Amino acid sequence: GIHSIELMDEGMILMDGPDMVYHTVGVVTTEAGKPQYVPITSIGREWYNTHGSVDIILDKSQRVDFFYHNTKENEIEGAACDIKGLPKRPPKTTRIRIEVSFTSQTEGVILLKDMGFGEMFPATGKIIVFPFTLIS
């Protein structure tokens, strides 16, 4: 059954159960010149209710680095997804929508969709499927 296991920061209680997700899935973005972790999913929900999305703007890189933060053990895993097959565009003119969903407590899929950048750089409709398996 479901029961609380620990008092988190800011008075939140992390619920424990056979279907609960303990990882956030997120990306690191740069804001005001400083790297910042942006979670896409949150913890404390059943895997089948855990999903989220965020839009990012690619700079020079054609890859997205994902981080999986195990909040129960305070461990972080990383993975990189190369984005191939997009038309050549100047830096900061490619918007990617990242959608994350879990398929079990420790597995899921990340969809990366090319959203283009206005009329000058239209979306291609390309979708990259990036499955993940959490090891911690």
Regions found by a protein language model. Give the residues of each.
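Acidic low-complexity intrinsically disordered segments
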Residues: 1-136
